[in-house]
């Protein structure tokens, strides 16, 4: 409801009159009461709501993904005309969007599955928008979406036509997977700095402030520096009194499931999903901590040197994560015939969304130079960073392993990097085993 309200207010602020409807009359009245003088027109029946719109109608749905979306569409259909456009701005599973697009197209309606990133504030002030569906229908809503989208530093709006049917929601799903990876990498950096150097929250805030002024400049690093200094009403640092269980809404899981379907090695992002799952086993972990032994963390040595190693490890880990995510976009584009423009996708992530970061411009540049590049690690800029920073990543992972500090995504970054650059892997033995017990055959070199 909040996302829908904020998007309506955003659209209204750009000079449009907006018809609004909610199943709950009270919710509709609440929005009107809280926003006097706005060009928001309330309707209390679906029929009146639909009939208030000029044709072709442009209807933005902001409902909980799943059966609720189908129910909302079914309630609208009796009052729609051929050519009307439904825009689903929820966190919808892309296969559902493909199905709805197919079904509605058969009835003469247009359907645009649209990823919206930026949270409640982004919805109000300007989100990153990822629309997918009929190109001709997108052209009819593009003027509105362009006006309400976030604007990057170069003045470009953070919206672009992604591709047919479920492409927009797919890109939003992978965006969320990358977000999981970013957040877990940052959490592991925090754990290393606390465990290895015993940094105070003030020192952590200072470190992240410095990081945010360099290569790691991003929304997530920016908010993390603020989190470290936030105190509760009792004067305690808030981060220290928050239970160490990270919840999830399932979009990271969808990204990993799709990777398995496509045969894509999305190891870092998948480890970040598993890290949330194991964090949720709090009672088991507390019990296991009293039974299972491991090394006590030893000081990590020179403070400035270790902080710089962790910074480099974090940046290279982030690059590996995005390389995996964009490789998956490439595989999905081929599988679903979407013809995705990876450079444009990186561009619309530069503002408004949760993963907005300075280095996204480097991704756009890499695809501008070579649109068909198989993996971002092969692009000159990222290859150079890997050359320069891999030793720091290896040192940090080795320190963590020796000192019993779990770093699943840092470790996944090293393993993926070494696997991807290996001309030969021991999979020949696995194939021999498969042939031995199951007559699966094998290929000779």
Swiss-Prot record:
Its EC number is 1.1.1.44. Disulfide bonds: none annotated. Pfam families: 6PGD, NAD_binding_2. The keyword Oxidoreductase applies. Substrate binds at residues 91, 117-119, 175-176, 180, 249, 276, 434, 440. Pathway: Carbohydrate degradation; pentose phosphate pathway; D-ribulose 5-phosphate from D-glucose 6-phosphate (oxidative stage): step 3/3. NADP(+) binds at residues 1-4, 22-24, 63-65, 91. The active site is at 172 (proton acceptor), 179 (proton donor). GO terms for molecular function: NADP binding; phosphogluconate dehydrogenase (decarboxylating) activity. One of its GO terms (biological process) is D-gluconate metabolic process. It catalyses: 6-phospho-D-gluconate + NADP(+) = D-ribulose 5-phosphate + CO2 + NADPH. The keyword Transit peptide does not apply. InterPro entries: 6-PGluconate_DH-like_C_sf, 6PGD_dom2, 6PGDH_C, 6PGDH_Gnd/GntZ, 6PGDH_NADP-bd, 6PGdom_BS, NAD(P)-bd_dom_sf, Pgluconate_DH. Keywords: Gluconate utilization, NADP, Oxidoreductase, Pentose shunt. Homodimer. Catalyzes the oxidative decarboxylation of 6-phosphogluconate to ribulose 5-phosphate and CO(2), with concomitant reduction of NADP to NADPH. Belongs to the 6-phosphogluconate dehydrogenase family. NCBIfam families: gnd, PRK09287.1. This is 6-phosphogluconate dehydrogenase, decarboxylating. It comes from Shigella dysenteriae. The lineage of its organism: Bacteria, Pseudomonadati, Pseudomonadota, Gammaproteobacteria, Enterobacterales.
């Amino acid at each position: 409801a909040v996302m829908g309200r904020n998007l309506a207010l955003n659209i209204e602020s750009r000079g449009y009159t907006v018809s609004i409807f909610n199943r709950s009359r009270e919710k509709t009245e609440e929005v009107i009461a809280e926003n006097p003088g706005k060009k928001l027109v309330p309707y209390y029946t679906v029929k009146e709501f639909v009939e208030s719109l000029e044709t072709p109608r442009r209807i933005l749905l902001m409902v909980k993904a799943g059966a609720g979306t189908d129910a909302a569409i079914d309630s609208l259909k009796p009052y729609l005309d051929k050519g009307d456009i439904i825009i689903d701005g929820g966190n919808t599973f892309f296969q559902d969007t493909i199905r709805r697009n197919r079904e509605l197209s058969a009835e003469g309606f247009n359907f645009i599955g649209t990823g919206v990133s930026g949270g409640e504030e982004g919805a109000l002030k300007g989100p990153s928008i990822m629309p997918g569906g009929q190109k001709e229908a997108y052209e009819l809503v593009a003027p509105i979406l362009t006006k309400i989208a976030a604007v990057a530093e170069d003045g470009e709006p953070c919206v672009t036509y992604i591709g047919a049917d479920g492409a927009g929601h797919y890109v939003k799903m992978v965006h969320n997977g990358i977000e999981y990876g970013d957040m877990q990498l940052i959490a592991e950096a925090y754990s290393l700095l606390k465990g290895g150097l015993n940094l105070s929250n003030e020192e952590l805030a200072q470190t992240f402030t410095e990081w945010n002024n360099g290569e790691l400049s991003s929304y997530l690093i920016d908010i993390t520096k603020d989190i470290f200094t936030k105190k509760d009403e009792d004067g305690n640092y808030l981060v220290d009194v928050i239970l160490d269980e990270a919840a999830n809404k399932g979009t990271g899981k969808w990204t990993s499931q799709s990777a398995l379907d496509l045969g894509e090695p999305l190891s870092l992002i998948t480890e970040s999903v598993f890290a949330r799952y194991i964090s949720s086993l709090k009672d088991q972990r507390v019990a296991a901590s009293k039974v299972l032994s491991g090394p006590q963390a030893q000081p990590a040595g020179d403070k400035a040197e270790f902080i710089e190693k962790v910074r480099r490890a974090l940046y290279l880990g982030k690059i590996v994560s995005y390389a995996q995510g964009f490789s998956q976009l490439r595989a999905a584009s081929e599988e679903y015939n979407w013809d995705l423009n990876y450079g444009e996708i990186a561009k619309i992530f530069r503002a408004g969304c949760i993963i907005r970061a300075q280095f996204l411009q480097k991704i756009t540049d890499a695809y501008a130079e070579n649109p068909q590049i198989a993996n971002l690690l092969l692009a000159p800029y990222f290859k150079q960073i890997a050359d320069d920073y891999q030793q720091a990543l290896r040192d940090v992972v080795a320190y963590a392993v020796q000192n019993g500090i779990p770093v699943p995504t840092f470790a996944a970054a090293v393993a993926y990097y070494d696997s991807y650059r290996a001309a030969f892997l021991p999979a020949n033995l696995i194939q021999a085993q498969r042939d031995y017990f199951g007559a699966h055959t094998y290929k000779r070199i």
